[in-house]
Structures are given as C-alpha cells and as structure tokens.
Amino acid sequence: MDDMLTKIQERTKCLIYILMERQIRAARLEQLLLDYISCKPHDKLCKSSMEGFTTERSLKYTRDCPQYAAVTTSQPRYRIEKRSKRFPKTAQMELENWYTENEDNPYLSKRDLQQLVHKTGLCAPQVRNWVSNRRRKERTLTISKELSDLLNQDTRCSPNDVV
C-alpha cells in the first residue's frame, strides 16, 4: 500500500512539474507574441527572438519521473531587451497636437491613424495605445479637478452657512 502511495505521489509531482512548465511556456509565448506584434517590421531584435522560440530543448525534472514525463519545451535564444518607454519628442508633439485638435471626440478614425503612423514613425498599436492612455489621463485629470473644486467649496463654508 505504501509503495502504491509513493508511486502516486511521484507521478503527481511529475504531472505538477509538467503543468507548471506548460503554464510558463504559454506565458512566455504570449509575451513574445505581444512584443513581436508591437515591433516595427525592421526591428531585428524582435524577429530574432521569435526565431529563437522555435528551438527545441529537452527538460528532465527528476530521475524519479517516468519516461513520458520528459517534456520538450521551446526557449528563446535571445532576451528581449526592454525598449525605451518614451517616444521621441517630435512624435509626442504630433500626438499631443492631434489630441488637442480632436479633444471633443478623441477617437481615431482609420485615416487619422494612418496619418499619425506616417507623421510619428510609430506603429499603429503604439499610436492606438497612446491615444487610449491619453483619454484615460484626461478623465482622471477631470475627475481630480472636480474633486478638488468640491473640497475647496466645502472649506470655504463657515459654521453659519450650515443649516
């Protein structure tokens, strides 16, 4: 009975390792795909890291695991370097100018998107993300301004004003 329990525990441990490895692979693949999609076509670093993802490598977890537990996984050969978080000043100015001109309706049309991609040198997902983030920033600025106005009104009240 103990022997059977030990075998079950060993196999359970191996299955847990396999599941963890698959989750890690899926997360890595998802991140690589997101990075690759947001890269410009001429960005060699992103392309080379995606090519490296197809390289197979065998993993063995423990010597107690049965043969079927040896799993192959793909590992990138190159690390994706973190890119600069700020856009060039000219691109920021173009995007900011577009936003102020379209403040009443700050949503991109296909034509606007193409023009901004051409003017800024950024790719379409970067432009869409910037505009989305800018709308969010505008909402929070508006809300915080309204809150501060309300707080200022409350502090101006005197005890005689309260009924």
Curated annotation (Swiss-Prot):
Q: Which gene encodes it?
A: MATALPHA2
For this protein, the record's InterPro entries field holds: HD, Homeobox_CS, Homeodomain-like_sf, KN_HD
Name the UniProt key words of this record, in alphabetical order.
Answer: DNA-binding, Homeobox, Nucleus
Protein name in UniProt: Mating-type protein ALPHA2
DNA-binding region location: 80-142
**Additional note from the record:** In P.angusta, all mating-type proteins (MATA1, MATALPHA1 and MATALPHA2) are encoded on one idiomorph, consistent with the fact that P.angusta is a homothallic haploid in which any strain can mate with any other strain.
Record's Gene Ontology CC terms?
nucleus
Task: Report the locations given in the UniProt record.
Answer: Nucleus
User: What is an example of a GO molecular function annotated in this UniProt entry?
Assistant: DNA binding
User: What family does this chain come from, according to its entry?
Assistant: Belongs to the TALE/M-ATYP homeobox family.
| Protein purpose | Mating type proteins are sequence specific DNA-binding proteins that act as master switches in yeast differentiation by controlling gene expression in a cell type-specific fashion.
Locate the transmembrane regions by residue number: none
An example of a Pfam family matching this protein is Homeobox_KN
Read off the Gene3D superfamilies from this record. Homeodomain-like
